[in-house]
Every structure is written in structure tokens, then in C-alpha cells.
A protein has these predicted regions:
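Cytochrome P450
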Residues: 1-392
């Protein structure tokens, strides 16, 4: 019989260090469990999250109290129905399969080759700083249609926005950094928006400014910020997670090197294994029951994608990285109307361009024997360092 939510005490620091033990405890307690440090009812079960994502009338994206709104403005991620449908449609031309293949994949190849050119003469590096962060940043600058923006700047903006969106502890310094990043992005948009209005092109900003229904500058700004948040960290962290998964499973790496079509499997498994976007929030619009838990109108629920993608009721041996795992739907790109618009672009960038080039250009790639990688986060999760060596 459904009951009121259980609760547990866990700190944000503990979640950031390793959320998976907590996710397992929550799953044992109920479908939605109150975690006071997050100010959310956390949902960790695969089927419970799918149920919520299929019912946006009850589990609404529209959420006036969302941290995302406070940090980035009222974006399409916090809208439902026709309003969401229109704003999503305004960015989709930049992500069409034909546009990705014709315009973006060749540019991704050029950027990757240039970064690897700079590494080939070396014998060790931290792939986060020297490759994954600049790769994701430079590709996103191209996709957005920004000009004169350094990759280090957009990487900082993205991290500041993500930190702000996950600032459930109310840290004032984090909030100030997010505000500064938001203001800098507004300036970057202002510098190019008239150019894109006059010259239609494949970029996201051009797509927005030539949409059938005119968008306000406020709408454009908010949606660009959402794209900078998720559109940078997802490819960056999925690059690093896939490389980490393969380097810690040498037999799987051998299989991939022998059959490059398996790079796509490795990418999908990495997104499941460590979901870069690990949690997002929904507002309960009316009294309801989710699984075994009674929820009240205006409750805030955190859909823990990182937990759902390791739900043992869905995936066998879920904590293992296994590229030979039977193909099953995961939630690494979300679900329902808010399924990630950039999914194909990310699959092409990472699975078809980045991974083959890394392992081809950096022979005998392996983890650094003296500097283990570090993984952090729960709202957004991935390696924050990935020291590697190659050659001899």
C-alpha cells in the first residue's frame, strides 16, 4: 500500500564523491525518498523515472522554483506542451542528420586532429585538460555560432552554470559565479546575433533567429545557456568515461581495436555506466502516487538518471562497464518530450570521431601508473582528471 516518503540523511559532499551507495539505499526505502540536504524527493528506479517522464501533466518540467530558472532563465527545459514544443523545434534544424553529417562531422574531425597533433610528440597528459575539455568546448562554439570566444571561457561558463544549477546547498560563491557566467554569455550572444539574423547558416543561433515563430531575446539567451550547460559537459564527460571504461577493461579495448564498429557500443555503455547528466528536477503538479510513495502537489522530485541507469531490476551487473551488454534502452539522454535534441550529434562526435582518433593517434594508451583518475559529482558526473601515458 502506498505510504508517505521515507527519508535519509546524506551530505552533498558524500553524493559528489560517490552517489551510488546512496542510490542503492534509496531504492530499498521507496520509489521517492526525501533527502533534506538536496531539498528534493529523490527517485532512483528506472521504471519510476520512465513513468514520471511519460506523465508531464503530473510531473511537470514547468517549475517556477527551479534552480535552473534562477541560473539560466526560463528555458525550454522548464516548459511543457506547446511552449516547449515550439522552442525545441527552433533548435532542431542545427541537429538534423543531414546537417550533422555535412557540416558538423568534418568540423569535429578538424578540431580533434588539431588537438591530437599537439599531443603526439608528448608521452603523457591529463586528457581532461588537454583534449576532452577543449574538444567539447571548441565543437560547441562552432555549433552555437559564437565568434571570438576562447574555449577556456565557454568551459568556465558551462561549469559555473552547472554548479549553479546544482547548488542545492545555497552556496553564495557558487551563485555569484553562475551569475557572472550568465552575464558573459549574454554578451557573447549580443556580439553575433545580428550577424546570424542576416546570414542564415547551420548554427544553433541562426536556427533560433530564423524560426517560424519569433523568439524573444530572453528566450534565446535562456536556451543557449541550457545548451552550454549540458551540451559541453555531456560530450566532454562521455569522452573521458568511455576512455576510462576501455582502459580499465583491456579485453574490451582489444575488441574495440579489432572492430571499430564497437566504438558506438562503448559510447552507449559509458553513458549508461556514468551518466553525465545525472539528475534533473520535476515539480509534482497535483497529489499523486509514484510507485509505492505518496507525493503531494508542489513537491520537488529529483529524477536520478545516474541511479536508474544502474538499477539492477533493469540491468544485469549494473556497476560493470560492459560493451557486450545486450542492447537495452538507457536514460543517458533523458526520455519523453525532453529527450536530448543533440543525441545524434553527440553520438557522431564521440562514437565516430573522437574515440577512433584517440586510440589511433595515441598508441598503447593506458592509465598513468602514478596518478589515478578522479570522478566527481551526482547532478553532473564524470572524470575531473584522466591522466594517461602512451607510446613505450
Amino acid at each position: 500500500m502506498p505510504s508517505a516518503p521515507a527519508s535519509i540523511e546524506i551530505t552533498i559532499a558524500e553524493l559528489n564523491a560517490n552517489p551510488y551507495p546512496t542510490f542503492e539505499r534509496i531504492r530499498e526505502l521507496g520509489s521517492a525518498v526525501w533527502v533534506s540536504s538536496t531539498r528534493l524527493h529523490l527517485v532512483t528506479g528506472f521504471e519510476d523515472i520512465v513513468c514520471a517522464e511519460r506523465n508531464h501533466e503530473v510531473f511537470a518540467s514547468t517549475n517556477p522554483n527551479s534552480l535552473l530558472n534562477k541560473v539560466m532563465g526560463h528555458s525550454l527545459l522548464r516548459k511543457d506542451g506547446e511552449e516547449h514544443k515550439f522552442e525545441r523545434a527552433s533548435i532542431e534544424p542545427a541537429f538534423r542528420a543531414s546537417v550533422v553529417s555535412k557540416y558538423w562531422v568534418p568540423r569535429f574531425q578538424e578540431i580533434s586532429a588539431s588537438l591530437l597533433d599537439a599531443l603526439e610528440s608528448e608521452n603523457e597528459t591529463d586528457l581532461f585538460q588537454s583534449y576532452a575539455a577543449p574538444m567539447a568546448s571548441l565543437c560547441l562554439i562552432e555549433l552555437l555560432g559564437f565568434k571570438g570566444v576562447a574555449w577556456q571561457d565557454i568551459a568556465w561558463w558551462s561549469q559555473a552554470l552547472m554548479d549553479g544549477a546544482g547548488n542545492y546547498q545555497g552556496d553564495e560563491a557558487i551563485a555569484c559565479r553562475a551569475t557572472a557566467a550568465s552575464e558573459a554569455i549574454d554578451m557573447a550572444i549580443d556580439a553575433v546575433i545580428e550577424m546570424h539574423r542576416k546570414d542564415e547558416n547551420p548554427s544553433i543561433l541562426s536556427s533560433m533567429t530564423h524560426a517560424k515563430q519569433t523568439q524573444s531575446l530572453e528566450q534565446i539567451r535562456a536556451n543557449i545557456k541550457v545548451i552550454i550547460g549540458g551540451g559541453l559537459n555531456e560530450p566532454r564527460d562521455s569522452i573521458l568515461t568511455t576512455v576510462l571504461g576501455l582502459l580499465t577493461n583491456p579485453h574490451q579495448l582489444d575488441a574495440v581495436l579489432a572492430d571499430q564498429e564497437l566504438y558506438a557500443n562503448a559510447f552507449e555503455e559509458a553513458i549508461r555506466w556514468v551518466s553525465p547528466i545525472g539528475m534533473y528536477v520535476r515539480r509534482v503538479a497535483e497529489d499523486t502516487v509514484l510507485g509505492d510513495t505518496i507525493l503531494n502537489a508542489e513537491d520537488q522530485v529529483g529524477l536520478c538518471i545516474g541511479a536508474a541507469n544502474r538499477d539492477p531490476a533493469r540491468f544485469e551487473n549494473p556497476h560493470a562497464f560492459d560493451i557486450h551488454r545486450p542492447r537495452m534502452r538507457h536514460l543517458g539522454f533523458g526520455a519523453g518530450p525532453h529527450f536530448c535534441a543533440g543525441t545524434l550529434t553527440s553520438r557522431k562526435m564521440v562514437g565516430e570521431v573522437v574515440l577512433p582518433m584517440i586510440f589511433d593517434r595515441l598508441p598503447k594508451l593506458r592509465l598513468h601508473p602514478d596518478h589515478p583518475p578522479i570522478e566527481r559529482g551526482w547532478v553532473f558526473r564524470g572524470p575531473t582528471t584522466l591522466p594517461v601515458v602512451w607510446k613505450n
